[in-house]
């Protein structure tokens, strides 16, 4: 529904709409779900009746804007676990990096590396809450992973075993990370986009040092209205 509840994958849940529906309608909708895709939070056991009532009342209130998260906050979260000069200068394991799968273990907060030939798990790495995606660098040496909590992990696949060498938190909520693959810039940069704040950050590809933050807030192309939450997915 979006951080500000103005609508995203799900419909808008702003007070002008939810107050019109009424408390009892909202409670039934939350508890039993809908054919259109709304989960049955109550009958599935995720929320009890008291929590359903609380949620129905909550979405009738004006949503507060979450705190901002800028370069200063990113730098405070940034951690280089293994400096570049202490990393291997050649591949130290026998993994076939040309035929290696990175599989998200979302609920467990981990990533499994699976050999493409044997289909066996060769390594499992802790990456944090609700891993969303992982992306290989252009050279195939590094693996970038990002969770929905906007924490980015940089994994060195040359190490034995593959290990996290740097990490950073780039926002409050995120879905995407990628590394530079353009000729001449291979592995040099990484970019992560966030749902909140609506922005993306360019990082050093070998250390995840945050270099530049670019906001995406602005006017819509058609009606020229200010959009406070253009999420970067």
Sequence positions of predicted segments:
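Short coil/turn segments that connect the beta-strands within blades of beta-propeller domains
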Residues: 98-100, 139-141, 182, 186-188, ...
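Short loop/turn segments that connect beta-strands within beta-propeller blades
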Residues: 115-119, 157-160, 204-208
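A short beta-strand motif characteristic of beta-propeller blades
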Residues: 120-125, 161-169, 209-223
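Structural signal for beta-propeller blades
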Residues: 110-111, 151-153, 198-200
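Repeated scaffold domains used in trafficking and secretory/extracellular systems
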Residues: 81-91, 130-136, 172-182, 219-232
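Conserved beta-strand positions in repeat-built beta-propeller and related beta-rich domains
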Residues: 103-106, 115, 137, 144-149, ...
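Flexible coil segments in periplasmic/lumen-exposed cytochrome c-class electron-transfer proteins
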Residues: 39-107, 111, 116
């Amino acid at each position: 529904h979006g951080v500000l509840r103005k609508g995203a994958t799900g419909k808008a849940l702003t007070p002008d709409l939810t107050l019109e529906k009424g408390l009892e309608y909202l409670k039934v909708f939350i508890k039993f779900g809908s054919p259109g895709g709304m989960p049955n939070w109550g009958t599935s056991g995720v929320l009890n009746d008291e929590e359903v009532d609380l949620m129905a009342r909550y979405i009738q209130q004006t949503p507060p804007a979450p705190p901002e998260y800028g370069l200063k906050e990113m730098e405070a979260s940034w951690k280089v676990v293994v400096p570049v000069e202490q990393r291997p200068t050649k591949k130290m394991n026998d993994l076939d990096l040309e035929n290696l799968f990175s599989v998200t273990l979302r609920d467990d907060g981990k990533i499994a590396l699976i050999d493409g030939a044997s289909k066996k798990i060769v390594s499992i790495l802790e990456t944090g809450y609700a891993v969303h995606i992982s992306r290989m660098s252009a050279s195939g040496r590094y693996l970038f992973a990002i969770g929905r909590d906007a924490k980015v992990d940089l994994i060195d696949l040359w190490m034995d075993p593959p290990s996290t060498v740097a990490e950073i938190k780039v926002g409050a909520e995120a879905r995407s990370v990628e590394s530079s693959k353009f000729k001449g810039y291979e592995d040099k940069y990484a970019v992560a986009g966030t749902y909140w704040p609506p922005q993306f950050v360019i990082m050093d590809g070998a250390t995840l040092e945050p270099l530049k933050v670019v906001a995406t807030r602005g006017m819509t192309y058609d009606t020229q209205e200010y959009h406070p939450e253009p999420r970067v997915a």
